[in-house]
């Protein structure tokens, strides 16, 4: 096995993928040919937290573009519009936590988020813990407005809408591929699901789902979209068999070849059979759009990969139509947001609150 640096930027310099960050790996001991091997491209995003619009480095509204503006679904739409036509065998997957984080959720709930996700054209989504912040009824309304499947194998609910709309997996027959979803089992302690909505062990749920798919279908290609966190993704990889590719979220973990990254993209872990499992995630808030080509063999193992997170900065154009829509949605809450309720002499930065004690957390808790 060896790592090599790609000679050219797959998606173009316009999307800020540096050549030294676009990494590909092929397994020398296996020969890749047309007999049962299949290549598919995955775009993935996680933990957007209602950042429909661009934002500053701290996650707040971008009021000083000269200091850098990042993310926003108008930039994501541009990247997809300009790259997906040349990657027809591709899936766009959402790893959850679209709710909670900006006025787009505080003011509108899930309404404008659903409109945006449908317009972007996601192929499937798993749920994050924050999707339950306003309870099962609100989540149910959101799910009924979506135009793509929702997958989470470890959610068991007696809520009629959740029970009907959330499935353990979804098969994409055009690719002979099944996508399995799971949600952190800590959700009841950190969000507000109904009493009749339960979260089981994600590792057991994924293995049971793999076994079900393998025993009832001819599908061998599997991928998991997991809102359980980077450490739990690695545990999932180690403690299961038959799964070779995981796209994760929840822990806001930066992976890749750039300053601040905590691991490689992908991270490779061996499963119970000693086979490799490839794990990717795309940080937070939509600052990065994950992108990776994966070649599966006939048994569903990953032969090769090629890709890197796409950094969405000022250099990435915004789709004008979607940005105009987002700007219009801002109107009703702009005056509300301007109401002064207090004053601070220091910046109450919340960007590190998930990793350590932070000023905003101290202010709220104390």
Where are the language model's segments positioned?
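Hard-cation-handling environments
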Residues: 292-295, 301-366
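Fungal secretory targeting signals
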Residues: 1-19
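Acidic, metal/ion-coordinating pockets
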Residues: 17-313, 360-365
